[in-house]
Swiss-Prot record:
PROSITE patterns: LON_N, LON_PROTEOLYTIC, LON_SER
Protein name: Lon protease homolog, mitochondrial
Lon N-terminal domain residues: 102-313
GO biological process terms held by the UniProt record: cellular response to oxidative stress; chaperone-mediated protein complex assembly; mitochondrion organization; oxidation-dependent protein catabolic process; protein quality control for misfolded or incompletely synthesized proteins
Additional notes on this entry: This protein may be expected to contain an N-terminal transit peptide but none has been predicted.
Domain (Lon proteolytic) ranges: 811-995
Key words of the record: ATP-binding, DNA-binding, Hydrolase, Mitochondrion, Nucleotide-binding, Protease, Serine protease
Length: 1002
């Protein structure tokens, strides 16, 4: 019997330990235990910790008895715990073999075999209450008996659930007559509501009825008939059962875990348990299973079980044949599909194709066929599913249009299509320099990107953020970068964007749903590696539709945008090859998580020299051509451009400068038109061109084509075009002169007609050529004079100067010091003025004006305190601050001012007033000061340096911590300046009042 127990453990390895054997039965998924899977998560497993597999009465060895005793002790302990909460207290647990009278439970579907769990639902509340009471009284047993079919019904025909309802209504003898006599002693392991979980122990047989409601019967415990475990016939039969189960396993994966576990230990088994196991997991008829349960002869029981598993084998073979037939049918369908495709092609060639759905499907398949090798597998799967769905939908349904639009977007995207990048660093440098002057930091970063791509052989997407004032070229540099890299360019502005769907797309459930901007970008450019410019990222909105800044986190994260998910497409898109360039004016407005994903490149404002280059080489030239004015007709001198920059356009960028230049050339164009100048080619010029070159039109086209094909000939072509235009203008002027001299009294219409004929005759004769040359010489004296714009007449075209000279004093008086400020318009000078209001013992005070912010007011208070300490150290006998009320003012009172960088300037102004000494001439300073006199770093070094140069300042004082920022400036910015870098205010005092300094001249 030790071998029998081991075999049972092999068959039910978890049954002998605890309830996890329910998982094995669940894997079997036999009809008997289909409902049991719902209990695996909690209810059965908790009960299984104390429920034990009950041995059959035939197994009388000590180990089986010990297992039963342990189970009974566990049940007794539970009953004792439950009994404390009730009035009935039973000190011991009834053993299974002592159960001679049990409550009868009807089983409608399958019999319960010993060693298996089964959940049933008890609808009779009285019966359910009796089971609960028995369990509390430590009698957790009941008899489970299979219900017979009604007389006159075929057991092989499935009926409705009405019979089940009638069983619940039966009581007493009526119910007893419907039950099979042989059943199973079941332990009640769990009661949850009306669900009762039973564990089979041993076979029972009803002898008589004890009670009608609930039905209670007397039972006899059945034992297997004695058998010889070494009998060859029994062994052979059991081996055949195991072999059949193995074949079932090969044919079907059903019950895989259970059969493998059992057959691994085929030498250690218990024949009765093997028979019960095979019958229990089979899907046989319930009455055949009942026959196995009733059979006490082990050999006969094995034979019955063998018949059942053989039937399962036949079912598996039938399943295989069905699967094979289906596969053959699918192959036939594929053949039919190929023939249909050929038929469609023939119809298409003959013009007989009229099915819109078929045409749409063909169009989508044709699109994706070219991208099939590069398109991800999951996208192809979605497309195939949607195409199948499209064929099943009616063309008039709304879902048809949704599916069609979805397929249109899916198939049009450039899956795996990348444009060939240009990794030529010199070519990129040339393009960037052609389009933009300056911006060395941006150009250097792009060249680094190209260099890395050249070494790797491929490039990865990056996220770059260009920050700077308006008009410095942040947006336009994006196009130049795309041209230098040979990438497609796409720009979309997110300024004021408050809807997440603009980035991530709409769900397809919404009417009029559209993909997000990134998907639209890929469709527009046709490549998967464009350069995307996200403009004004610092001005993202936030509304009820979500936070777009948070939606951009996934888009602008190189680790996440490999699988960017658009709500509309709902399939991952690879954006790892996209180069993102963002622009912002104030990076402090960008959320920190988003800012962390970007590489910041700060673009400072342009200095005067840079603006001059940009105006002369780009703005003035392009504006003149856009207005149709030739270089010989108008000129804007360098002096005019310099005055325009200094007095009208002091902002950091050049956008306003471009507007002013456009304004100048518009007025020049109006002036030229009023003088009768026209640059349009005349009819006579066309006649001359045609007479000189017979194939004039073809030559022009040829010249154009050659210019497009060979960039080296572009300048020559432009020169030829300018020459032709100039000759046409001179010819037009000649015509007007001849008209005026020859036909002064004719009406305009007659004059034009006569002149046209006359001019044509003259042009066709040698005499005409001589007259034309003479007319040219005569018209040269009468030609319109060239319009020249210089600083003297600039006001006639752009109005009065907007900015006056920032420098008010050649030599600052006592109490006045020049500071340096930094605004959105760039750098500027800022005077700090201090004067004494009132004097008297103990009247020391400070008054502030000039629309100062809180930070600047606090800085003034600190300056007042530090100034008193400095004065006490330098001139102990001077009691100015103790006895004087001081008024500090910052001019331009209508302009709000704030910031700590004027601290050292305020101290110097107060000390100048206190000592009665003016500061050094041509001196400007900036720096935040602490109460201990330390000078802290400031921002905007370049802008402040430019402002100082504009005001003819010779000496500048900067904090020592800003030396690195100053060293990075261009040489032309630092040229001619005496710069001091200080750590404490005492150094500034020596520079401002004693001129004993250690300087650094740049």
């Amino acid at each position: 019997m030790l071998r029998a127990a081991a075999a049972a453990a092999a068959v039910f390895p978890s049954r002998f330990a605890a309830a996890p054997a329910v998982a094995a039965v669940e894997e079997v998924r036999s009809p008997l235990l289909r409902v049991l899977g719902a209990l695996r998560g909690g209810r059965v497993s908790t009960l299984g910790r104390r429920a034990r597999f009950c041995s059959n009465s035939a197994g009388s060895d000590s180990e089986a008895a010990a297992a039963e005793a342990k189970a009974e002790d566990a049940v007794a302990a539970e009953g004792e715990a439950d009994g404390k909460a009730s009035s009935a207290i039973v000190p011991t647990v009834l053993r299974p073999e002592d159960c001679l009278s049990v409550i009868a439970l009807p089983l409608p579907h399958r019999p319960l075999f010993p060693g298996f769990y089964m959940p049933i639902y008890v609808k009779d509340q009285k019966l359910l209450q009796a089971l609960v009471e028995n369990r509390k009284r430590s009698i957790p047993y009941a008899g489970a008996f299979l219900v017979k079919d009604e007389e006159g019904t075929d057991p092989n025909i499935v009926t409705s659930s009405d019979s089940d309802k009638s069983i619940d209504d039966l009581k007493g003898k009526e119910l007893l007559q419907r039950l099979n006599e042989v059943g199973t002693l079941a332990q009640i392991t769990s009661i949850q509501g009306d669900q009762v979980v039973l564990l089979g122990h041993r076979r029972l047989k009803i002898t008589e009825m004890v009670q009608e409601d609930p039905l209670t019967v007397k039972v006899d415990h059945l034992k297997e008939k004695p058998y010889d475990k070494d009998d060859d016939v029994i062994k052979a039969t059991s081996f055949e059962v195991i072999s059949t189960l193995r074949e079932v396993l090969k044919a079907s994966s059903l019950w895989k875990d259970h059969v493998q576990t059992y057959t691994q230990h085929m030498g250690d088994f218990n024949y009765p348990r093997l028979a019960d196991f095979g019958a229990a997991i089979s899907g046989a008829n319930k009455f055949l299973c009942q026959e196995v349960l009733e059979e006490l002869d082990v050999y006969k029981r094995l034979k019955l079980t063998l018949e059942l598993v053989k039937k399962e084998m036949e079912i598996s073979k039938l399943q295989q044949s069905i699967a094979k037939a289906i596969e053959e049918k699918i192959s036939g369908d594929q053949r039919r599909y190929l023939l249909n495709e050929q038929l469609k092609a023939i119809k298409k060639e003959l013009g007989l194709e009229t099915d819109d759905k078929t045409a749409l499907s063909a169009k989508f398949r044709e699109r994706i066929e070219a991208k099939k090798e590069k398109c991800p597998a999951h996208v192809l799967q979605v497309i195939e599913e949607e195409l199948t769905k499209l064929q099943l939908l009616e063309a008039s349904s709304s879902e048809f249009n949704v599916t069609r639009n979805y397929l249109d977007w899916l198939t049009v995207l450039p899956w795996g299509n990348y444009s060939d990048e240009n990794f030529d660093v010199h070519h990129a440098q040339q393009i960037l320099d052609e389009d933009h002057y300056g911006l060395s930091d941006v150009k250097e970063r792009i060249l680094e990107f190209i260099a890395v791509g050249k070494l790797r052989g491929t490039s990865q997407g990056k996220i770059i953020c260009l920050s700077g004032p308006p008009g410095v070229g942040k947006t336009s540099i994006g196009r130049s970068i795309a041209r230098a890299l040979n990438r497609k360019f796409y720009r979309f502005s997110v300024g004021g964007l408050a809807d997440v769907a603009e980035i991530k797309g709409h769900r397809r459930t919404y009417v009029g749903a559209m993909p997000g901007k990134m998907v639209q970008c890929l469709k527009s450019v046709g490549t998967a590696n464009p350069l995307v410019l996200i403009d004004e990222i610092d001005k993202l909105g936030r509304g009820h539709s979500g936070d777009p800044a948070s939606a951009l986190l996934e888009l602008l994260d190189p680790e996440q945008n490999v699988n960017f998910l658009d709500h509309y497409l709902d399939v991952p898109i690879d954006l790892s090859k996209v180069l993102f360039v963002c622009t912002a004016n104030v990076i402090e407005m960008i959320p920190n998580p988003l800012l962390d994903r970007m590489e910041i490149i700060a673009i400072a404002g342009y200095i005067t020299d840079e603006k001059m280059h940009i105006a002369r080489d780009y703005l003035e030239k392009n504006t003149r051509e856009a207005c149709g004015i030739k270089p010989e007709q108008a000129e804007v001198t360098d002096a005019a451009l310099l005055a325009l920059i200094e007095s009208y356009c002091r902002e950091a960028g050049v956008r306003n400068l471009q507007k002013q230049i456009e304004k100048i050339y518009r007025k020049i164009a109006l002036q030229l038109v009023r003088q009768g100048v026209s640059n349009e080619p005349t009819q006579e010029a066309a006649i001359v061109t045609a007479s000189e070159e017979p194939n004039g039109g073809d030559s022009a086209n040829k010249l154009k084509d050659e210019t497009m094909e060979d960039p080296a000939t572009e300048n020559a072509a432009m020169t030829n075009a300018d020459t032709a235009s100039k000759e046409a203008s001179e010819l037009d002027l000649l015509k007007r002169t001849v008209d005026h001299d020859v036909h002064p009294a004719e009406t305009p219409k007659e004059a034009v007609l006569t002149d046209s004929a006359l001019s044509t005759d003259k042009l066709c004769t040698p005499e005409g050529n001589k007259d034309m040359e003479g007319a040219k010489e005569e018209s040269a004296d009468k030609a319109v004079e060239k319009v020249v714009i210089d600083s003297s007449n600039l006001g006639d075209y752009v109005g009065k100067p907007v900015f006056q000279a920032e420098r008010i004093y050649e030599q600052t008086p006592v109490g006045v010091v020049m500071g340096l400020a930094w605004t959105a318009m760039g750098g500027s000078t800022l005077y700090i003025e201090t004067t004494k209001v009132e004097e008297g013992d103990g009247k020391g005070a400070l008054v502030l004006t000039g629309q100062l912010g809180d930070v600047m007011k606090e800085s003034a208070q600190i300056a007042h305190t530090v100034g008193r300490a400095i004065l006490l150290d330098k001139e102990p006998e001077n009691l100015f601050f103790a006895n004087s009320k001081v008024h500090l003012h910052v001019p331009a009172g209508s302009t709000p001012k704030d910031g700590p960088s004027a601290g050292c300037t305020m101290i110097t102004s107060m000390l100048s007033l206190a000592m009665g000494k003016p500061v050094k001439k041509d001196l400007a300073m900036t720096g935040e000061v602490t109460l201990t006199g330390r000078i802290l770093p400031i921002g905007g070094v370049k802008e402040k340096t430019i402002a100082a140069r504009r005001s003819a300042v010779k000496t500048i004082v900067f904090p020592a911590a800003n030396k690195r920022d100053f060293d990075e400036l261009a040489p032309n910015v630092k040229e001619g300046l005496e710069v001091h870098f200080v750590d404490t205010y005492n150094e500034i005092f020596d520079i401002a009042f004693q001129s004993e300094t250690q300087t650094e001249t740049s």
